[in-house]
Structures are given as structure tokens and as C-alpha cells.
């Protein structure tokens, strides 16, 4: 059974400004494992990576129904890629999480569908 759906879209230039302007932006948004991946990226690819993770985490928090805040933080959510490159969202819940991330020249977008573990 579907428990929630969340979507988020973010402008790449907004994320780029936050990366360049706020010293701890990446540390507040990305887990240590995600930061290790980000450290290998530069320029537009880094911005796309951070924006995609930001949008995915926002979409997850919307699907849960809480938003980012007291109950769910950016660092409670980790996104890794499987062997085929598909993004997979990890968190400390029992939900089955379906995630899709996409980019264009100007935007990153992510959608999350939460499913109950006993379907």
C-alpha cells in the first residue's frame, strides 16, 4: 500500500550559490558517505549531485509528511547508487522507498513514493 508521495524541484543556480556562499552547506545536507562522493566531483557535476540529493531528501520528508525539521533531518537520509547507477534512499524506517532523481540545465527534481513493508 502506498503511504505517501513527495516531490521536490530545485534550481541548480540556487544550490551553486549555497555551495559557494555557505561554508557548511554541504556538511549540513550530505552524509559523510555522500560527501566522499561529492569530493570527487567538480563544477556543474558537483552542483547536480548536491541538488539531486537535496531534492531527494526534501521529497522524502514530504512523502513522510513532516518536512525537514525536528523529526527528519538531511543527515538522517542517505542516498547511494546501486550497481546500475540507480539512486537508492536509505533511512532508519521500515518503509519501502522508491526514488527517482533527474536534472535539466536549470533544475534538479526528485520524486519519492513510500510503500508499507507488508503489501
Swiss-Prot record:
A UniProt-annotated Pfam family: ACPS
Gene Ontology CC: cytosol
Residue sites binding Mg(2+) per the record: 8, 58
Subcellular location: Cytoplasm
Chief location category: cytoplasm
NCBIfam families the record matches: acpS, pantethn_trn
Keyword terms of this UniProt record: Cytoplasm, Fatty acid biosynthesis, Fatty acid metabolism, Lipid biosynthesis, Lipid metabolism, Magnesium, Metal-binding, Transferase
Family designation: Belongs to the P-Pant transferase superfamily. AcpS family.
InterPro entries on file: 4-PPantetheinyl_Trfase_dom (IPR008278), 4-PPantetheinyl_Trfase_dom_sf (IPR037143), ACPS (IPR002582), P-Pant_transferase_sf (IPR050559), Ppantetheine-prot_Trfase_dom (IPR004568)
Catalytic activity: apo-[ACP] + CoA = holo-[ACP] + adenosine 3',5'-bisphosphate + H(+)
Cofactor: Mg(2+)
The keyword Cell inner membrane belongs to this UniProt entry's keyword annotation: no
GO BP of this protein: fatty acid biosynthetic process; lysine biosynthetic process via aminoadipic acid
Protein name: Holo-[acyl-carrier-protein] synthase
EC class name: transferase
Cytoplasm listed as a keyword: yes
GO molecular function: holo-[acyl-carrier-protein] synthase activity; magnesium ion binding
Function: Transfers the 4'-phosphopantetheine moiety from coenzyme A to a Ser of acyl-carrier-protein.
Enzyme Commission identifier(s): 2.7.8.7
Amino acid at each position: 500500500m502506498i503511504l505517501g508521495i513527495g516531490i521536490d524541484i530545485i534550481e541548480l543556480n540556487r544550490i551553486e550559490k549555497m555551495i559557494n556562499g555557505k561554508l557548511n552547506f554541504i556538511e549540513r545536507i550530505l552524509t559523510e558517505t555522500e560527501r566522499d562522493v561529492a569530493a570527487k566531483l567538480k563544477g556543474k557535476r558537483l552542483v547536480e549531485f548536491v541538488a539531486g540529493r537535496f531534492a531527494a531528501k526534501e521529497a522524502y520528508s514530504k512523502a513522510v509528511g513532516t518536512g525537514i525539521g525536528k523529526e527528519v533531518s538531511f543527515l538522517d537520509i542517505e542516498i547511494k547508487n546501486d550497481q546500475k547507477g540507480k539512486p537508492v534512499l536509505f533511512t532508519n524506517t521500515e518503509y519501502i522507498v522508491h526514488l527517482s532523481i533527474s536534472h535539466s540545465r536549470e533544475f534538479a527534481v526528485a520524486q519519492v513514493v513510500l510503500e508499507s513493508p507488508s503489501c
